[in-house]
């Protein structure tokens, strides 16, 4: 198994990743006989709920594999809850393989802007003690302690 992500390759506990983000590119070097899970934020999300997070780095791969290959702009594989999470990168699909009915949303600049994403993330973060701010048009959201 090869799990690659901008914040974590794999999550396994029953924790919650809250208000996190990744902006770096993720490059997946495929192993010929391995299963592959790669995403802009997390490769294999097996146990952590995700709340108000985003990813913007491009996700690319080199090589090939005879195993399964699940790559998404936000998550490679997902087995838990995703709430108010967003991505903006080279992928049309946010989650490569999704066992839950929740989904991340793509910021396309037209239907979904960063301001709309920040508003939704802040609604989800009402009791978390932090808030996202979108102050400069064209820039990325920043996190601020309340």
Short names for language-model regions:
Residues 1-146:
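Predominantly extracellular beta-rich ligand-binding scaffolds that present long acidic/polar faces
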